[in-house]
Amino acid sequence: MSVKIRLKRMGSKKRPFYRVVVADSRSPRDGRFIAQVGTYNPLTEPASVKLEEEEILNWLNNGAQPSDTVKNIFSKAGIMKKYHEAKYTK
């Protein structure tokens, strides 16, 4: 089972709101997920992002792969830098 960290679309039509979730790569975009690790609202200025950093780092260390968009969100929040430092400075 390949696990991905990706965005799950919520909100109404033309008013998107996303949950950052950990899900099986075979499940549909808005389908079943394993854990919710944050939220992302692109409509606010600036876009509001709330992430559970410890849980995200735990999932990344266990092999979860972030989607491209989620990887960009994590990079802006500094999570990818912490992950790479922890992974390669052992």
UniProtKB/Swiss-Prot annotation:
Any one Gene Ontology BP term: translation
Lineage: superkingdom: Bacteria
Keyword terms: Ribonucleoprotein, Ribosomal protein
Disulfide bonds listed in the record: none
Any single GO CC term annotated in Swiss-Prot or TrEMBL for this entry: cytoplasm
Pfam families documented for this protein: Ribosomal_S16
Molecular functions per Gene Ontology: structural constituent of ribosome
Keyword Magnesium set for record: no
InterPro entries cross-referenced by the UniProt entry: Ribosomal_bS16 (IPR000307), Ribosomal_bS16_dom_sf (IPR023803)
UniProt key word Ribonucleoprotein: yes
Assigned protein family: Belongs to the bacterial ribosomal protein bS16 family.
UniProt xrefs under NCBIfam families: S16 (TIGR00002)
HAMAP family in the record: Ribosomal_bS16
Name under which the protein is recorded: Small ribosomal subunit protein bS16
Organism for this UniProt entry: Pediococcus pentosaceus (strain ATCC 25745 / CCUG 21536 / LMG 10740 / 183-1w)
Gene that specifies this protein: rpsP
